[in-house]
Amino acid sequence: APVPGLSPFRVV
């Protein structure tokens, strides 16, 4: 799962 705060993986 994408980690919030880390680009380019951003949770909107």
Curated annotation (Swiss-Prot):
It is found in: Secreted. The keyword Lyase does not apply. Keywords: Amphibian defense peptide, G-protein coupled receptor impairing toxin, Secreted, Toxin, Vasoactive, Vasodilator. The keyword Repeat does not apply. Its main location: secreted. Expressed by the skin glands. Belongs to the bradykinin-related peptide family. Induces relaxation of mouse trachea that has been precontracted with methacholine. May induce relaxation of arterial smooth muscle. May target bradykinin receptors (BDKRB). This is Bradykinin-like peptide AV-12. It comes from Ascaphus truei (Coastal tailed frog). The lineage of its organism: Eukaryota, Metazoa, Chordata, Craniata, Vertebrata.
